[in-house]
Structures are given as structure tokens and as C-alpha cells.
Amino acid sequence: MKISILGAGSFGTAIAIALSAHGISVNLWGRDHRNTTHINTYRKNLKYLPTYHLPDNIYATSNIDEVLSDNNTCIILTIPTQQLRTICTQIQHKQHMCKNTPILICSKGIEITSLKFPSEIAEEILQYNPIFILSGPSFAKEIAEHLPCSIVLAGDNKELGESLIEKISNDVLKIIYHQDIIGVQIGAALKNIIAIACGIIAGKNLGNNAVATVITKGMNEIKTLYIAKNHSIDLHTLIGPSCLGDLILTCTTEHSRNMAFGLEIGKGRNINTLIDHNLKLVEGTSTVKPLISLAKKLNVELPICISIYNLLHENISLDKAISNILS
């Protein structure tokens, strides 16, 4: 069995390690030719996960043609949401090589230009490929260390989804199926912004009670947007790994880049400097603008999310933002 992963960052590399350890051949694509060559030569991704060994059945390449073929069990995309349209277009141009191959998307967030979630972007472009979302509480380093996580595969085709789970689920990647593909992505997008808020509260030393308050209020904001977008709610999604589980993980540890980013803000670091240094790594900073635009379009209020937006982009004071978050 062969699987291709597009995105040779921390998460893509960790998924490759977890799959290859269970006998799956993995093609790992990344833009940086020097890095992919180094992976093949030294069996380490020095750029992103330098301390972890990559098994020999992982082949890295910067040539996208090498990873798009009709004998892939699936193609997994582990790239930032704002780059997803470009990559999907490249796949679409190679449809003769991978038509009907399932696409599993790990991207989290909302596209700035269209206000679309990752699955909506992919479905717009890749009309012949079954689209799934793979999401849940899953730090790359823990996956690379073969520690277990529970994640969700969401998509419309239940039979195909469950078949994929049988093939790729293992003692590290414990995967369950959901049909609620939009609900899963709402939780994945909002949790990063809520984690920034939790980091700010922790950085200001306002206590664990206040952090718990933000998590609780944040869960309500996920539910609010969920109902507005989906016109219904699936409790299995809301209290499952992709919403509640990912929210708890992202909001309660400094290993979360979004929480750590908020922590530095709470400690008084310059916000613009932090954004400049972390824009590509902290998903919440790129998600908050389109999220607020989507909330306005759907006529819903998300107090925590608008507070973070105003803090990052409208120059309100930190104390005012904290007051709004906790009010």
C-alpha cells in the first residue's frame, strides 16, 4: 500500500512516520528540494523534526509529479489553508494521474479570499476526488514518538471513509468516522483563536479559573457558528475529538503554538513583532480575519474571536481585550 503526503512540515512528517512504521510506503512532498534531499540521505527532517528518524519506506521529493499517481490509496494534504487552493489546482492539472483518489485534508482554518473551509475549497476544484477531513487533537512531536491520538475522518462517503480507516488507522493514529465534515472544520478553525485568548489570560497570570472560563465560552462560540453554518448540530461532533478534544489540547499547553503566542502577548511582548515572527506558524492569526467576516455574513456574535481580532488588527489595548474576553 502506498500513500502520498503533500506537505513536509512537522505534521506531514509525523504522519509519514506513523504510517510508515506500520508497513505503508509513503511519498512525502515538500517545496524545499534541499530539505527533501536531506531526508532521503540522512533519514531526518532537520528543518522541522530534527530529532526523529524517518524509516526507509518514506521517500521525500520536491517534484509533485512523483507523488501524484493512480496507485495511491489516498493523498493526504498537510499544508496551510491559505496555500490549499494552489495545491488543489496543481492536483487538478494532474487529474489523469490521480483521478478518483481520495484526498484527506489536515488543513485548519478559513480561506481569506473566499471565506471557505478547506473541504469547500477542495470540492470546488477537485470534482472527481472524494474529499475527507482528517482532524483532531494531535501534536506532531507526540505522533512522531508513536504516542496515541484519537482523530476524526469526516466526509460524505461513509463506506469509503470506513474503508480508509481500516487501512490507515493503527495504534498511534486511532481514527473514527464522522459524516459532519463542516462541523469538524468549525471546531478546528475556532480552537486556534480561542487558544490565543487562553494564552493571553495565562500570560497575564489571571489563573486557571479564568482559562477554564475562556474554554467554556469558546466552546459556546464554536456551537454558535456551527448552528449558523450547518443549520443543525451533531453532539457527537461537538463533544468529540475534533471540537472539544482539540479545543482542550490547544488551549491548555504551551506546546500549542497558538496558546504560546497568546502567552507572549499576555506577558507584554509587542504584538506586531510576534505576528511578524509567527505568521506562518500560528494558524489563529491567519484565521481570525476571515472568521470575523464569515460571522458577520452569518449574523452571529463571537465575543472572544472579535476581541482577538480587535487586539491583533484594530489596536485595542490588551486590558480592553481581556475585559471583553472575560465579560
UniProtKB/Swiss-Prot annotation:
GO terms for cellular component: cytosol. Gene3D superfamilies: N-(1-d-carboxylethyl)-l-norvaline Dehydrogenase, domain 2, NAD(P)-binding Rossmann-like Domain. Its main location: cytoplasm. The keyword Cytoplasm applies. PROSITE patterns: NAD_G3PDH (PS00957). NADPH binds at residues 10-11, 31, 108, 140, 257, 281, 283. Pfam families: NAD_Gly3P_dh_C, NAD_Gly3P_dh_N. Its EC number is 1.1.1.94. Pathway: Membrane lipid metabolism; glycerophospholipid metabolism. The active site is at 191 (proton acceptor). GO terms for biological process: carbohydrate metabolic process; glycerol-3-phosphate biosynthetic process; glycerol-3-phosphate catabolic process; glycerophospholipid metabolic process; phospholipid biosynthetic process. It catalyses: sn-glycerol 3-phosphate + NAD(+) = dihydroxyacetone phosphate + NADH + H(+); sn-glycerol 3-phosphate + NADP(+) = dihydroxyacetone phosphate + NADPH + H(+). GO terms for molecular function: glycerol-3-phosphate dehydrogenase [NAD(P)+] activity; NAD binding. It comes from the Bacteria. InterPro entries: 6-PGluconate_DH-like_C_sf, 6PGD_dom2, G3P_DH_NAD-dep, G3P_DH_NAD-dep_C, G3P_DH_NAD-dep_N, NAD(P)-bd_dom_sf. Keywords: Cytoplasm, Lipid biosynthesis, Lipid metabolism, NAD, NADP, Nucleotide-binding, Oxidoreductase, Phospholipid biosynthesis, Phospholipid metabolism. Catalyzes the reduction of the glycolytic intermediate dihydroxyacetone phosphate (DHAP) to sn-glycerol 3-phosphate (G3P), the key precursor for phospholipid synthesis. PANTHER family: GLYCEROL-3-PHOSPHATE DEHYDROGENASE, GLYCEROL-3-PHOSPHATE DEHYDROGENASE [NAD(+)] 2, CHLOROPLASTIC. Belongs to the NAD-dependent glycerol-3-phosphate dehydrogenase family. This is Glycerol-3-phosphate dehydrogenase [NAD(P)+].
